[in-house]
């Protein structure tokens, strides 16, 4: 199981929620993050344990990997 840090941001780039999850893959972390995002979420950032950016998504777009 891999560890992913998920950060939910609003339009002003303020952190709405931040969580650490254990998932089998980045795809599973993306699905989980999308499901748990609130209506106020503008951007979702996913990074690994050492805060290396792995993927991000804006509310109106698709996932993009860094």
Where are these regions (language model features)?
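A short, charged, amphipathic alpha-helix used as a generic interaction element across diverse proteins
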Residues: 23-43
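Short aromatic-glycine-(Arg/Gly/Cys) micro-motifs in beta-strand/loop hairpins
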Residues: 1-17
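Generic detection of short hydrophobic beta-strand segments and adjacent strand-loop junctions
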Residues: 19-21, 57
């Amino acid at each position: 199981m891999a560890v992913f840090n998920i950060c939910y941001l609003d339009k002003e780039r303020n952190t709405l929620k931040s969580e650490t999850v254990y998932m089998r893959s980045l795809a599973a972390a993306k699905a989980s993050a999308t499901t748990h995002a609130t209506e106020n979420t503008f951007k979702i950032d996913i990074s690994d344990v050492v805060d290396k950016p792995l993927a991000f998504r804006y509310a109106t777009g698709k996932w993009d990997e860094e």
